[in-house]
């Protein structure tokens, strides 16, 4: 599994936390010190924790598990989508709708509505109704795509969440926790690490840092999937040899 080095993290600014006055005391074990009233994260703690989290994500992917990338703030939104698309996984990058996991039955109905509208827009149904009706349906479709587009093909609850900002996405983490879904999350010095199974202490605002986390996670998923294919191929060879 590809490992991320301390040099990579330093260059991306992973070690810069928040201003000291905003800190969460529960993050004390992961803080090296402070400089100019800004907490410095101890990368000697972060590096092994991050690589352990990547190994876990890779193992989920190797078992064909579904990974949901979550990051709805502006600094993370595009990178979250790009990473999920890169490794053929799922994402929420605009707004976390309350109950997205805990009320999956209702979410599934909304996804069905989105897919029905997509079908209607392609099969000629829109040609048979008024322009005003088409406009209303297009707006509804765009709204649904905006909030559910990244999970419309998930086909059920995810096996794991990869969260960019534990503080900003606390509702998603709580829902996952209630359902027993493991959570991997970037946790900055102002955040509460409770409820996170795989804590990655690090800067959750710098775009370069966010991209480092997400690209590494996407690569771990891809490697995990490839490992699964290799194992299946080997098992196939054993079966042939036995015959």
UniProtKB/Swiss-Prot annotation:
Please provide the record's keywords in A-Z order. Ribonucleoprotein, Ribosomal protein
**InterPro entries of this UniProt entry?**
Ribosomal_uS2, Ribosomal_uS2_bac/mit/plastid, Ribosomal_uS2_CS, Ribosomal_uS2_flav_dom_sf
Q: Name one GO biological process term.
A: translation
Instruction: State the superkingdom.
Output: Bacteria
Q: Which GO terms describe its cellular component?
A: cytosolic small ribosomal subunit
Q: Which family does it belong to?
A: Belongs to the universal ribosomal protein uS2 family.
Indicate what this protein is called per its UniProt record. Small ribosomal subunit protein uS2
Gene Ontology terms for molecular function: structural constituent of ribosome
Q: Which Gene3D superfamilies match?
A: Glucose-6-phosphate isomerase like protein, domain 1, Helix hairpin bin
Q: What is the lineage of its organism?
A: Bacteria, Pseudomonadati, Pseudomonadota, Gammaproteobacteria, Alteromonadales
């Amino acid at each position: 599994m590809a490992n991320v080095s301390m040099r990579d993290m330093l260059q991306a600014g992973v070690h810069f936390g928040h201003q000291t006055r905003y800190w969460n005391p529960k993050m004390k074990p992961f803080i090296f010190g402070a400089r100019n009233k800004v907490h410095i994260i101890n990368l000697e703690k972060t590096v092994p924790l991050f690589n352990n989290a990547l190994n876990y994500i890779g193992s989920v992917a190797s078992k064909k598990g579904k990974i949901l990338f979550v990051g709805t703030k502006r600094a993370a939104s595009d990178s979250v989508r790009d990473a999920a698309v890169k490794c053929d996984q799922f994402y929420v990058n605009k707004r976390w709708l309350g109950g997205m996991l805990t009320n999956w039955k209702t979410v599934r109905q909304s996804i069905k509505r989105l897919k029905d509208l997509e079908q209607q827009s392609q099969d000629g149904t829109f040609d048979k109704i008024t322009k005003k009706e088409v406009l209303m349906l297009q707006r509804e479709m765009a709204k649904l795509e905006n909030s559910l587009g990244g999970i419309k093909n998930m086909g059920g609850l995810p096996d794991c969440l990869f969260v960019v900002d534990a503080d900003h996405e606390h509702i998603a983490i709580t829902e996952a926790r209630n359902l027993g879904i493991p959570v991997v999350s970037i946790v900055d010095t102002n955040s509460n690490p409770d409820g996170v199974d795989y804590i990655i202490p690090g800067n959750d605002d710098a775009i370069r840092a966010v991209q480092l986390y997400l690209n590494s996670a996407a690569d771990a998923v891809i490697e995990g999937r490839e490992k699964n294919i290799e194992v299946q191929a080997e098992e196939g060879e054993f079966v042939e040899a036995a015959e």
